[in-house]
Amino acid sequence: MKAKGSVFRYGDNVDTDVIIPARFLNTSDPLELAAHCMEDIDADFSSKVNAGDIIVADDNFGCGSSREHAPISIKASGVSCVIANSFARIFYRNAINIGLPILECPEAVAVIEAGDEVEVDFDSGVITDVTKGQSFQGQAFPEFMQTLIAAGGLVNYINATEK
């Protein structure tokens, strides 16, 4: 499985309240959540993001409250994956559970800039900054996690395997 897109670049400690502000948690509709994704840190995000685009961030992405709405809003906005130095553990699990690929790779994060074209091979963990012509080895997901992501998340995986 691969993804390719333009990069949106953010710093440290992007918390779930910034990813999807609490004032929008009165809905679980993914498209409505996507319309407000990142708006407190990047007001034009929802109008600029295109299907396949990639978020790259520094340390502790997804910290803060444990809300599944955060990775849902990112995925529904069209973002194909998030690459960061590190993720808050609960965000990491929530992202996998809803089928949003996330990769830790400090070497890539140190080089990739906003607007760069990046390609990610989830099977191998290779992250390529196409703009700069550089590749980095991220941590590939174990096969079972790749299966969950390919199924669109844990619920979809369970529904498909129970039939």
Curated annotation (Swiss-Prot):
Superkingdom, according to UniProt? Bacteria
- Single Gene Ontology BP annotation: L-leucine biosynthetic process
Induction is noted as: By nicotinic acid.
A Pfam family: Aconitase_C
Annotated PANTHER family: 3-ISOPROPYLMALATE DEHYDRATASE SMALL SUBUNIT 1 (PTHR43345:SF2), 3-ISOPROPYLMALATE DEHYDRATASE SMALL SUBUNIT 2-RELATED-RELATED (PTHR43345)
The record describes its quaternary structure and partners as: Heterodimer of a large and a small subunit.
This one is known as 2,3-dimethylmalate dehydratase small subunit
Identify the species of origin.
Eubacterium barkeri (Clostridium barkeri)
State the taxonomy lineage: Bacteria, Bacillati, Bacillota, Clostridia, Eubacteriales
